[in-house]
Amino acid sequence: VTAGQGIRPAGRPGTQPAGVSRWADLGGPLHYLDFGGPADGPLIVCVHGLGGSAANWVAVAPLLTGGCRVLAPDLAGHGLTQSRGRGTGVAANRALLHRFLASVAPGPVILMGNSMGGMISLLEAGEHPGAVAGLILVDPALPFLAARPDPLVAAMFLLYLAPGVGRVVMAHERRLPSARRVAGVLRLCCVEPARVAADVITRHVEVLDQRARFTGTGQDSSAAIRSVVATVGCPGRLAYQRRIHSVACPVLLIHGTGDRLVPIAAARAAARANPAWTLAEITGVGHVPQLEAPVSTARAVAGWLSAAGAGAAGAAAARRH
């Protein structure tokens, strides 16, 4: 996919500032990164996945700010946003995202969500269509209908969900050095982890180092995992499927062909079931194309914003005036 006219990358990965930290009071402190961009450009709000953070967008966001304004919040129980009594499941974080949009980014925006963040973005677009001009779904968590994850990935999630066992496993992981934990996640989520830039890895390690000082992170993670699995599997998958079909805004679905968590077959099935969507496959990358292949991801976004997503871009830019 080539970059579209009017939306241009602002630079190469690793050459741009990794966003300015800001805070909003939304029933407690919420951290987000402001990557800048033109004040009159469409606003893209990036929503990370399960166990992720706003740092998941530091490689691709600078490539979008030539034509777009880009923000990325840390959801409750993720990144630097501690739960502080707020729920960390899908429904609670969907509601928190809506509050973020209303408070920090009022008016229709383009939501760009990865994995669980794609699920939350879909649910927000279905629940509050006036708030969402368009969706960019990057390997979103999809219902377990057309395809299931890699058996080893499924076994890992079952281990986390097992009463008592999951708590012990997560406690052990939290005692590991942050760099080792980040490396493990990249091995799971990428086809070639070495493609992820060193400064991007460092940013993720820094986030985990800060999270090591927080309390209650194990319970927060367990609640989030249970909620995601309940939404894509039984009993929630049919309700989630209906919500997906109710989305009326333009949608770009970006998916790595080597994704082990959400197989490419699931994305292809979703695209067939929703023929108005635009599917952009990125060959040979995994679950986090925005980290493993940020240039290809940015090109797919740019091309869509200048073509099928032009109406969404216009609506998300008009809100700025």
Per-region residue spans from a language model:
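Alpha/beta-hydrolase fold catalytic core
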Residues: 1-44, 65-68, 94-95, 99-101, ...
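Conserved HGGG/HGGXW glycine-rich cap/lid loop of the alpha/beta-hydrolase fold
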Residues: 28, 33-82, 291
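Alpha/beta-hydrolase fold nucleophile elbow
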Residues: 105-115
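Flexible "cap/lid" loop of the alpha/beta hydrolase fold
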Residues: 126, 135-172
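Conserved alpha/beta-hydrolase catalytic His-Asp/Glu region
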Residues: 173-243
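Acidic catalytic loop of the alpha/beta-hydrolase fold
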Residues: 234-235, 258-262
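Short beta-strand/loop motif that positions the catalytic acidic residue
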Residues: 247, 253-255, 259
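Catalytic active-site module of serine/aspartate enzymes centered on a nucleophile-bearing elbow/loop
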Residues: 275-321
